């Protein structure tokens, strides 16, 4: 296909191996790559924006292959894409990619994900956007994930990818020859236990570390085909998960399922 202008961001920061692998994969396909990402790790920042301090950027071309323009930004992942689209890029990109994240972004955890938030900024600006993650914090081979992301993005653009639809891609942490298939998935509903670890400092004051472990993954009640697997079950079976996500979180069930509205609250008799 023709060369694309691709904006890449992440939440693991400008030095992350997954980021460099993704940028390299895109450039190898002949695409023009620009990177704008946090200057340090800012995982689990969700869709936070920096409002109480200025954003600062610094060129970081030397961290990437020749020909890739790169900036490290003092803000959040969402800040980075917003700033890139508004100020740093000469032209609107054809594609926004966020990742490759060092760890999964599955189920309702995407609401905490800086990786997904960066991609969502592209979606909100009607740019086809994808979040890419390898579902392990320890896995360090990102080459296949980078190739897969570019394959899927190129095909989706050829097939008239709706720009209002974010694609969330999760790759299982295993060798290429052990990966079974790629298919559409639903978001899981993830439940945690022991979310906080309580400790005591030398002065006797309590403090807390957010910890927690997943104890339950429930299938969502979305309106996709009933045979869609959950994203979590897909990864557990060494399959690639691709989940379509819309920024519109509006309720689509029937009115009869909602709590009744009492107009006497507005106009008491």
Curated annotation (Swiss-Prot):
Name of the protein described by the UniProt record: 5'-nucleotidase SurE
Disulphide bridges: none
Alphabetical list of NCBIfam families matching this protein: PRK00346.1-4, PRK00346.2-2, surE
Family that this chain belongs to: Belongs to the SurE nucleotidase family.
Principal cellular location given in the protein's record: cytoplasm
Pfam families: SurE (PF01975)
Cofactor info, note text: Binds 1 divalent metal cation per subunit.
HAMAP family tied to this protein: SurE
Catalytic activity: a ribonucleoside 5'-phosphate + H2O = a ribonucleoside + phosphate
Subcellular location: Cytoplasm
Gene, per the UniProt record: surE
Molecular functions per Gene Ontology: 3'-nucleotidase activity; 5'-nucleotidase activity; exopolyphosphatase activity; metal ion binding; nucleotide binding
Naturally occurring in which organism (per UniProt): Prochlorococcus marinus (strain MIT 9312)
PANTHER family: 5'-NUCLEOTIDASE SURE (PTHR30457), 5'_3'-NUCLEOTIDASE SURE (PTHR30457:SF12)
């Amino acid at each position: 296909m023709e060369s694309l202008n691709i904006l890449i961001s992440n939440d693991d920061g400008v030095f992350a191996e997954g980021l460099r692998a993704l940028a390299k994969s895109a450039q190898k396909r002949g695409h023009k790559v620009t990177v704008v990402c946090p200057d340090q790790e800012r995982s689990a920042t969700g869709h936070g924006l920096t409002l109480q301090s200025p954003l600062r950027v610094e060129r970081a071309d030397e961290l990437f292959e020749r020909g890739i323009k790169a900036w490290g930004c003092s803000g959040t992942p969402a800040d980075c894409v917003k700033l890139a689209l508004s100020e740093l890029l000469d032209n609107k990109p054809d594609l926004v990619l966020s990742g490759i994240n060092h760890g999964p972004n599955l189920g309702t955890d995407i609401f905490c994900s800086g990786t997904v938030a960066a991609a969502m900024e592209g979606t909100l600006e009607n740019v086809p956007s994808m979040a890419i993650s390898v579902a392990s914090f320890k896995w360090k081979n990102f080459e296949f994930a980078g190739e897969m992301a570019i394959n899927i993005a190129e095909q989706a653009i050829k097939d008239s990818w709706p720009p209002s639809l974010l694609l969330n891609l999760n790759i299982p942490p295993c060798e290429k020859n052990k990966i079974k298939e790629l298919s559409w998935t639903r978001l899981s509903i993830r439940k945690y236990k022991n979310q906080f670890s309580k400790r005591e400092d030398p002065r006797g004051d309590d403090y807390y570390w957010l910890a927690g472990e997943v104890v339950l993954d429930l299938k969502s009640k979305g309106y996709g085909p009933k045979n869609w697997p959950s994203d979590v079950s897909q990864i557990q079976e060494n399959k690639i998960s691709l989940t379509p996500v819309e920024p519109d979180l509006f309720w689509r069930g029937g009115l009869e399922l909602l709590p009744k509205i009492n107009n006497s609250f507005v106009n008491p008799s």
